[in-house]
Amino acid sequence: GLVGEILFNRLDTMQAEIRATRHPMFDADKLLEQVRQFSELSAAVTKEIEVRRDGEWGQRLLKDRVQVGGVMDGFMDRAHKEVSIALPMQRGAGKSADFSKPVDAEKRDMAMRYVRLVVGSRNFAAAGSFGAKQKDASEELCFYLRRYNEDVVKEMRNGENRAIAETQFHFAIALTALLFSEEEAELMRRRGKAAQAAA
């Protein structure tokens, strides 16, 4: 009926807006809101109208969800790369954090946008058909950041590149607050102060 057609037109429009989003020019908050709305509306349509998967609307809805999921899978896949550019590790077997040269603010901003996407989509990733990728990205980022945090505190205590380490430390705290918790970020701040005092 007419209501169904209106709802599906709205879903198509939302899906098209999400598909038009590209790296590197994207607003994380806007994209999160678009995907959240799409996920909620598509879930509501499925539940309320009891869309049959094999029907015309069921196929349309499935197609829209697959396309939105594909876009978000791409962003989730790229998150680790962007964070590793902003929090670089040395090449080689040991792979400890690299403080040999400063990281520019644009790279940190890009990494922050990706982390906000990963964290911000946690509650609706499954409904948006990218739950597995979101979970993988989140776990990968958490593991990477824990390793980096250990190295940055060590560098602040007795490293040769303390000024670079301090800039990276503040950025790592911001990521820690997002990926873990504000409490974990506060613990990190205290460890940093202790490292500076011991330097």
Residue ranges and their predicted role:
Residues 1-156, 163:
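Extended alpha-helical scaffold segments
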Residues 35-38, 169, 192:
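Short amphipathic alpha-helical coiled-coil/interface segments
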Residues 58, 62, 178-199:
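Beta-rich interaction/scaffold domains
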Residues 141-190:
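Extended alpha-helical scaffolding segments
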